[in-house]
């Protein structure tokens, strides 16, 4: 996986330093890598996501919410109780 310079030079400092949300950066990075591996959206539960990056389920949920607010992550579900599908956004590439 190739990481955009922006992710390391700007986004990491912004999420970890300014926003004080290091888990959000880990979630973003892991989902970006997984999206590349799967060649598309990532469908995964909060519990599986949390276990994949080594954090609590509530920390993963909070991070996903923060990334959605920052428009760095699109989340969709086919039903309210369905497992979410994630699509990493790269707004700096527009």
Each PLM stretch: what is its role?
Residues 1-52, 81-82:
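Short recognition helix of helix-turn-helix/winged-helix DNA-binding domains
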Residues 57, 61-94:
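Winged-helix/helix-turn-helix nucleic-acid-interaction surface
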């Amino acid at each position: 996986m190739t990481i955009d310079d922006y992710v390391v030079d700007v986004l990491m400092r912004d999420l970890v330093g300014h926003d004080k949300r290091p888990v959000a950066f880990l979630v973003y990075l892991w989902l970006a890598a997984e999206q590349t591996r799967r060649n598309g959206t990532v469908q995964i539960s909060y519990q599986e996501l949390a276990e994949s990056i080594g954090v609590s389920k509530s920390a993963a949920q909070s991070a996903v919410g923060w990334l959605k607010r920052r428009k760095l992550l699109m989340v969709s579900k086919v039903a309210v109780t369905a497992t979410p599908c994630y699509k990493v956004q790269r707004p700096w590439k527009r």
